[in-house]
Regions:
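Cofactor-pocket helix-loop regions in the catalytic cores of large enzyme subunits
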Residues: 1-48, 53-56, 92
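Thiamine diphosphate
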Residues: 38, 42-238
Length: 238
């Protein structure tokens, strides 16, 4: 069972659509996973103070709470929060806080069906960790390779007081962003069914992430050999 259809929206496309929907007075907030790296490359701030990013410590769950703070500090702006499903599950209850405080903001929840960023990093290091996908445990193999978990993010967000929209294609997301902007006095959540495969090309710089020196896995051994070759090219400018 595939995690998503190829026709579903992608994270880069979603960033583009949120940028276009933001307008001249909007701002965006984000915190963890692959989103900050993609937004660093793709987001185009319209005005000063319209880009709020926590990335140094990758604080999963900070997105919605931080967005509420921005919206309370600058009520004249329409705040957009972009968050993956993994981070959303860490602190989704802050939607209730936004409802309690009467804060209007748009939360764009990208449903990747798992922790995509750490899965990609794990794959690059030679590891195979199916527990990064939101799948059920297969009783025959004992691994998380069973059916995709039927997590109903739309129902969850609605139960916490949000007005909810859903989208699975770029056209649907464009419409949902427009409708969400009209919601005031309460949070609006757009649940976007996302194809996690399309990504944004990396920079030419190399990221020094050590790989295990000792492993029985041929994939890890190959990743370690590649790491050691790249390490020889590393230069310190400090």
């Amino acid at each position: 069972q595939p995690l998503a259809a190829e026709t579903h929206d992608s994270q880069p496309a979603a960033i583009r659509l949120v940028t276009e929907a933001r307008g001249d007075d909007g701002s965006v907030g984000c915190a963890a996973g692959g989103l900050p790296g993609d937004m660093h490359k793709l987001w185009r701030p319209a005005t000063r103070g319209s880009y709020h990013m926590e990335y140094g410590n990758s604080t999963m769950g900070d997105e919605i709470a931080g967005g509420i703070g921005v919206a309370m500090a600058e009520p004249e702006r329409r705040v957009h929060v972009m968050v993956g499903d993994g981070s959303y599950l860490m602190l989704a209850n802050e939607i209730m806080t936004a409802r309690q405080e009467g804060v209007g903001l748009t939360i764009v929840l990208l449903d990747h069906h798992g922790y995509r960023c750490i899965r990609n990093l794990s794959d690059a290091c030679g590891a195979v960790n199916p527990f990064n996908d939101f799948r059920a445990r297969d009783p025959e193999t004992g691994t998380f390779t069973g059916e995709v978990l039927p997590i109903d993010f739309a129902a969850n967000a609605a139960s916490l007081g949000a007005e909810v929209f859903t989208a699975g294609t770029p056209a649907e997301l464009e419409t949902a962003l427009r409708d969400a902007r009209a919601v005031t006095g309460r949070p609006a959540v757009i649940v976007v069914e996302t194809n996690p495969e399309p990504g944004v090309p990396a920079y030419d710089a190399w990221w020094d992430v050590p790989v295990a020196e000792v492993s029985v896995s041929e994939r890890v051994q190959a990743a370690r050999a590649e790491y050691e070759e790249n390490l020889k090219k590393e230069r310190s400018f400090v």
